[in-house]
Amino acid sequence: MEQTLRVSVFGATGYTGIELLRSLLTHPHFEVKNLISQSYKGKKVREVLPFFSNTYISEIEFLEEPVEDYELAFLCLPHEVSYEIVPKLLSQGKKVVDLSGAYRIKSPKAYEEFYGFKHEREDILQRAVYGLPEVFREEIKNSDLVANPGCYPTATLLAIYPFLKERVGIESVIVHALSGVSGAGRKPKQQFHFPEMTENFFNYAVEKHRHTPEMEDVIRRVYGREVKVRFTPTVVPTSRGMISTVYLKSEKLNVKELFKEVYEDEIFVKVVDEPPQTKWVLGTNYCFIYPHYDERTGYYVIISAIDNLGKGASLQAVQNANLMFGLAEDDGLLQLPVFP
């Protein structure tokens, strides 16, 4: 029996909202009913997003609040806004995939330090399931609130998960990740203005990045003990794409066999024999991983590539929603990369 599930997208005109719609419009079971946008309320989709003109949503108007009934909400909103909306949606019996960071970390204290607001909803923090399907698949299936991971944590955690799963000794984790400019969102910012960003790249949030406690929180939950992460992010002058290079020391093992065994049955994670490129994943939900052991230094070097808007955000959100409703995990996610 064909199942049709009605969907509302909050924050539908940001980059993650637009990427989400690209998947939802080809999804066999999800039907978009409400598109929420404070910036474009009252305007039709074809006026704001003309590339969706030939789709069934072209005449839908952007709203302040949903008017049609629905079962599933995707939140592509600022953290503080999601923080307020999630309890209301749960009380209405909706299932929620939240793409913000409002409910990702189990410790409320981390939010004051890294997000700048006081988190007073510990009950919902504990209720939320971290939406990394390759790690928390069974929990996601039984959840009504999934906290969709950040882009950097997705690329990094998939790069180290086999070590965590097998409980091999890890001393510390060093991460250097590079991201396209779309990771900064659609709102204009001077440092991402074309004349200043083109032929330029730079590190940021070197002292403190909000994705660091997110990574450490998941590592602690999966691995069973604390592991510190030294994380440095870099913005590069591309629209989208992410490469995460992870360095760690551990006991000697056949790292390629370990990764191939752990990810053997995963649809969207591919273990490869050469360093991956962002072009391989552009516009997709895939993650390509190259694990390597450097005999000279004794470091494991694991390189992962994702699309920061795909597996790093919106397409992973669809993967999570599929699991929440018992659908095929790859429904709406069969996009092939755009190349070159």
UniProtKB/Swiss-Prot annotation:
Pathway recorded for this protein: Amino-acid biosynthesis; L-arginine biosynthesis; N(2)-acetyl-L-ornithine from L-glutamate: step 3/4
Taxonomic lineage from the root: Bacteria, Pseudomonadati, Aquificota, Aquificia, Aquificales
Keywords from the named record: Amino-acid biosynthesis, Arginine biosynthesis, Cytoplasm, NADP, Oxidoreductase
Descriptive protein name: N-acetyl-gamma-glutamyl-phosphate reductase
Superkingdom in the source lineage: Bacteria
Gene Ontology CC, one term: cytoplasm
Protein role: Catalyzes the NADPH-dependent reduction of N-acetyl-5-glutamyl phosphate to yield N-acetyl-L-glutamate 5-semialdehyde.
Entries under Gene3D superfamilies matching the protein: Dihydrodipicolinate Reductase, domain 2, NAD(P)-binding Rossmann-like Domain
Active site: residue positions: 151
